[in-house]
Design a protein with these regions (language model features):
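Soluble FAD-dependent oxygen oxidases
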Residues: 1-323
Length: 323
């Protein structure tokens, strides 16, 4: 997405069946309100029968970077790990501007081994498209230097890989088959550069969203914005929350919940997700929004969080095509 734009920005045209049975075409020139709604406004406007999507040429170089962090000595709070994660989060906008994107994960505590022999840790797979390994290493160097102060407290392991086309990269790094069937309650927040200026504010948010020491709580970094995503802000038929156009990444905070959990247990988890974890993310980045696909359906500010300034326009479109 950093190089080619978000999925919604790839749609050139759609054929849609409306609630009254009519089939219409929408694109940059006709039925533009419906086109805008389909490109970022969530579901529910009609049934998409077909769509025309942009195609992009193959690439001849992708450089991938893998990083693992884990406490050398496990403690109840694993504070050193969270300190390092906070430093890393502050540096991600610069790293993204230098061409990096990808996904990161961290756990304060995990019920199984996560990194090495540790049940607490951070791991990421980042990459640069169209950048040589030497160029990527140069861009990564400031981050590695910042993490070096944790070398006496954390296990730090990193590696690099290069690929000569997109599909070999995808099959090795991204097209993986993760196990399905787990359940989790999620909240998310788009993170812009302004929200990361103060280390203490970042660290306070990380402390809360990482969960208590006795909780199984996961956090995911989606370093998928910047680059073309920012450039596509000029597209006047985009329906995405405009916060995407100024946020370099998203943070997703998730609480695992058993399929057999009682209603009371689920209610407690929902409350914690919305009013503890979600509130901490909003406090960190009050001027952005959420990633709708992995957002909190109980968010009391869902209009602003999910849609931003486009809420009224999308509501008008919904009432027009599917009242």
């Amino acid at each position: 997405t950093r190089n080619s734009g978000l999925g919604a920005d790839q749609i050139l045209e759609a054929e849609v069946m409306l609630a009254d049975g009519r089939v219409v075409t929408c694109n940059h020139c006709e039925n533009t309100d419906l086109f805008r709604a389909l490109r970022g406004g969530g579901p529910g406007y009609g049934i998409t029968l077909s769509s025309t999507i942009k195609a992009h040429p193959n690439i001849d170089v992708v450089t991938a970077h893998h990083l693992q962090l884990a406490p050398l000595e496990k403690t109840e709070n694993n504070s050193d790990l969270l300190d390092a994660v906070s430093v890393l989060l502050q540096l991600l906008p610069d790293l993204n501007d230098a061409g990096f994107s990808g996904y990161g994960f961290w756990f304060r505590n995990f019920p199984a081994v996560f990194v090495g022999n540790a049940t607490s840790g951070y791991s990421h797979g980042f990459w640069t498209i169209g950048t040589s390994k030497d160029e990527a290493k140069k861009a990564w160097a400031p981050v590695r230097k910042a993490l070096s102060k944790f070398e006496d407290k954390l296990f730090i392991n990193e590696s690099w890989a290069s690929y000569t086309d997109y599909w070999s990269f995808y099959n090795a790094e991204s097209g993986l088959h993760d196990p399905a069937g787990d359940t989790a309650i999620l909240t998310s927040r788009l993170i812009n550069r302004e929200s990361l200026k103060d280390y203490t504010r970042v660290r306070d948010a990380v402390e809360v969203i990482s969960g208590k020491p006795n909780e199984f709580h996961s956090n995911v970094i989606l370093l998928v914005s910047g680059g073309q995503v920012f450039k596509d802000a000029k597209d006047n038929t985009s329906g995405l929350n405009p916060a995407w156009r100024k946020s370099h990444y998203a943070l997703i905070s998730g609480t695992g919940i058993s399929k057999t959990a009682s209603l009371a247990e689920r209610n407690r988890a929902n409350y914690d997700t919305t009013f503890v974890k979600g509130a901490a993310l909003k406090k960190l980045a009050p001027e952005t929004g959420t990633y709708m696909n992995e957002g909190d359906r109980h968010d009391p500010d869902f209009k602003a969080s999910f849609y931003g300034e486009f809420y009224d326009a999308h509501l008008k479109t919904k009432r027009k095509y599917d009242p």
